C-alpha cells in the first residue's frame, strides 16, 4: 500500500501534462502581432533568412517555450522526485506565461501614445529597465523591434535624431540608429527610399551640409553598387532638378570635407548631360548663366559650359554658343559681353570670334551703320562719352566690314549727330587714349579730308573754332594738326600725276 501511495495515478499524470501543454500554448501565443525588420543578426542570436523576416515583438528567449518533461519518465517509473520536479516546472511555466513581452509592456505603460516625446517620458525609463532585465540576450534588438512596430521609418529617424541631442539618451539612440541602418542594409532598401526617409529630398542646395547626408553616404558605402558616384548622382537627380544640383555641387565644393565628392558628382553631371544629348540651352540655363549679364565670361561656370558645347558640338561650337547666348541676351548686351571678354587674355580669342559672328549676322540681315549705332545704344550717349564706350570699337568694326570707305561713313553719321566742331573736339580727345587712339586718328583724317574737299583753309577752321579767343588745348591741337594736313594735302593735290609724292598724302579729287 505504501508503494501505491507514492506512485502518481494515471489521472494525475495526464492532468499535469494537459496543464503544461495549455500553459505552453498560451505562452507561445501570448504575442501575435508581427514587426517587419531586416534579416540581420544582432549579437549572432537572431536567426537570419535570405531577405526579409517577421519578428514578434517579444525577444527570442521569451518565445521559445518547448514541451519538455524530464520528470515524466520518473513519475511513471515511480521515482520519489516527480512531485518536486513537477512543482518546479509548473512554477517556471507559470512565470513565463505571466511575463509580458516588451511590446505588451510598451502598450501597458501607454508609451504607444507618447509620439515624439517618447524618450523624455519617465515611463520609457521603466520600460527600458524591464526589457533589459527580461531580455538578457539582446535587449537593444528587443527595444528596436518594439519601436519599429510603433513608428514608421521616417518618424523613428526623427525620434532618434532628437534623442541623440540629449546626454541621457544619446548612447541608446545612437545604438538604435545603427540597428535601423543595419536593418535597411540587410533588407536591401533602395538608396532612394533611405534618402527620402532621412528627409534629404527637402534639403535643396544645402543637402551636403546636413548631418543626415553623411549618414546616407555611409549607407551607400555599405550598399552593393558597382558605381557609387553614379548611384549617388542618380538619387540626387531623382529629387532635385539640374539647376538645384548645380547649386548644390557648387556650394559643397566650398567645403574641404565635401569638395572631392562634389567635384566628382559635377563631372558625372556633365557626362550625363552629354550622354543624354542635352542641348546647350538647357545646360546654359541649369548653370544659371542666363542671369550673368555682361560679366558672363568671368564666370567659372561659363568655361565649363563652353567645354560642354565644344564636346557636344564638334562641327561648329562657336555658332552653337552664339545661338545660345542670343537666346537669352539682346544684341546690345551681347556686344558688351564680347567687349568685356576681349579685355581678358583667357577669353579674348573666344570673345573675338563670337563678336565676329554677331557682326556677320548683322551684315547678313542688312543692318545699316546707323542701325548698328542705335543697337549698341551709342545714340543715348552725349558726345563727351561716346569714345569712352566699349562699343565704339565694335561699331567701327561693323562699319569697316560693311562699307568700302568706313571712316567717311562714320564721320558723316557722327557729324550729323554732334556737329562738325563738337566732333572734331571729341576726336582730338580720343587720340589721347590708347584704346581709341587708332580709331580717332583714322576719323580725324577722314574729317580733315572732308574739310579739304570742301575748300576749307586753316583760316576757315580757326574762325570756326575761334582759335584767337580760345586758348584750350583741344582747339589749338585741332588748328595745328589741320594746318599740317592742309599743307601736305595741297602739295599732293598740286603735284603732277606722274610724280610720286614725298612724305605727303595723296587726296582723291
Swiss-Prot record:
Annotated signal sequence range: 1-28
Source species, domain of life: Eukaryota
Induction behaviour: Expression is induced during host plant infection.
UniProt keyword annotations, A-Z: Host cell membrane, Host membrane, Membrane, Secreted, Signal, Virulence
Motif (RxLR-dEER): 53-63
A Pfam family: PexRD54_WY
Subcellular location per the Swiss-Prot or TrEMBL entry: Secreted; Host cell membrane
Chief location: secreted
One term under GO cellular component: membrane
InterPro entries xref list: PexRD54_WY
Biological role: Effector that enhances P.infestans colonization of Nicotiana benthamiana leaves.
UniProt family annotation: Belongs to the RxLR effector family.
Domains as described in the record: The RxLR-dEER motif acts to carry the protein into the host cell cytoplasm through binding to cell surface phosphatidylinositol-3-phosphate.
Annotated protein name in UniProt: RxLR effector protein PITG_16195
Organism: Phytophthora infestans (strain T30-4)
Amino acid at each position: 500500500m505504501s508503494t501505491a501511495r507514492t506512485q502518481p495515478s494515471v489521472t494525475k499524470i495526464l492532468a499535469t501534462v494537459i496543464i503544461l501543454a495549455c500553459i505552453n500554448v498560451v505562452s507561445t501565443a501570448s504575442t501575435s502581432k508581427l514587426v517587419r525588420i531586416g534579416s540581420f543578426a544582432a549579437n549572432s542570436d537572431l536567426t537570419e533568412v535570405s531577405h526579409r523576416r517577421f519578428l514578434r515583438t517579444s525577444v527570442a528567449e521569451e518565445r521559445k517555450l518547448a514541451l519538455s518533461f524530464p520528470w515524466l519518465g520518473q513519475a511513471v517509473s515511480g521515482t520519489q522526485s516527480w512531485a518536486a520536479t513537477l512543482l518546479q516546472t509548473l512554477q517556471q511555466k507559470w512565470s513565463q506565461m505571466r511575463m509580458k513581452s516588451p511590446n505588451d509592456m510598451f502598450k501597458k505603460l501607454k508609451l504607444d501614445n507618447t509620439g515624439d516625446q517618447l524618450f523624455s517620458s519617465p515611463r520609457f525609463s521603466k520600460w527600458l529597465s524591464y526589457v533589459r532585465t527580461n531580455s538578457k540576450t539582446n535587449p537593444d534588438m528587443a527595444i528596436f523591434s518594439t519601436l519599429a512596430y510603433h513608428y514608421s521609418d521616417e518618424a523613428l529617424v526623427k525620434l532618434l535624431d532628437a534623442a541623440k541631442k540629449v546626454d541621457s539618451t544619446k548612447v541608446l539612440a545612437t545604438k538604435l540608429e545603427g540597428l535601423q541602418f543595419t536593418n535597411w542594409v540587410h533588407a536591401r532598401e533602395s538608396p532612394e527610399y533611405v534618402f527620402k526617409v532621412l528627409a534629404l529630398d527637402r534639403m535643396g542646395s544645402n543637402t551636403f551640409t546636413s548631418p543626415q547626408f553623411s549618414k546616407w553616404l555611409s549607407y551607400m558605402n555599405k550598399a552593393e553598387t558597382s558605381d557609387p558616384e553614379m548611384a549617388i548622382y542618380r538619387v540626387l537627380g531623382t529629387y532635385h532638378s539640374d539647376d538645384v544640383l548645380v547649386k548644390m555641387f557648387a556650394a559643397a565644393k566650398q567645403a574641404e570635407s565635401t569638395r572631392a565628392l562634389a567635384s566628382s558628382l559635377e563631372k558625372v553631371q556633365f557626362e550625363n548631360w552629354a550622354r543624354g544629348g542635352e542641348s546647350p540651352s538647357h545646360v546654359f540655363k541649369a548653370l544659371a548663366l542666363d542671369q550673368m549679364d555682361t560679366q558672363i565670361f568671368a564666370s567659372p561656370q561659363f568655361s565649363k559650359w563652353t567645354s560642354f558645347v565644344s564636346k557636344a558640338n564638334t562641327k561648329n561650337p562657336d555658332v552653337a554658343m552664339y545661338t545660345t547666348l542670343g537666346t537669352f541676351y539682346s544684341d546690345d548686351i551681347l556686344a558688351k559681353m564680347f567687349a568685356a571678354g576681349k579685355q581678358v587674355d583667357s577669353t579674348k580669342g573666344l570673345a573675338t570670334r563670337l563678336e565676329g559672328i554677331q557682326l556677320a549676322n548683322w551684315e547678313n540681315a542688312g543692318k545699316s551703320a546707323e542701325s548698328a549705332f542705335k543697337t549698341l545704344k551709342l545714340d543715348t550717349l552725349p558726345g563727351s562719352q561716346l569714345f569712352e564706350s566699349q562699343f565704339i570699337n565694335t561699331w567701327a568694326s561693323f562699319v569697316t566690314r560693311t562699307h568700302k570707305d568706313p571712316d567717311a561713313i562714320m564721320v558723316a553719321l557722327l557729324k550729323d549727330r554732334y556737329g562738325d566742331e563738337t566732333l572734331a573736339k571729341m576726336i582730338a580727345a580720343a587720340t589721347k587714349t590708347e584704346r581709341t587712339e587708332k580709331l580717332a586718328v583714322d576719323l580725324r583724317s577722314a574729317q580733315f579730308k572732308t574739310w579739304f574737299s570742301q575748300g576749307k583753309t586753316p583760316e576757315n577752321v580757326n574762325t570756326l573754332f575761334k582759335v584767337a579767343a580760345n586758348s584750350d588745348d583741344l582747339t589749338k591741337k585741332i588748328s595745328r594738326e589741320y594746318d599740317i594736313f592742309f599743307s601736305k594735302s595741297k602739295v599732293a593735290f598740286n603735284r603732277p600725276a606722274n610724280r610720286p609724292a614725298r612724305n605727303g598724302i595723296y587726296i582723291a579729287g
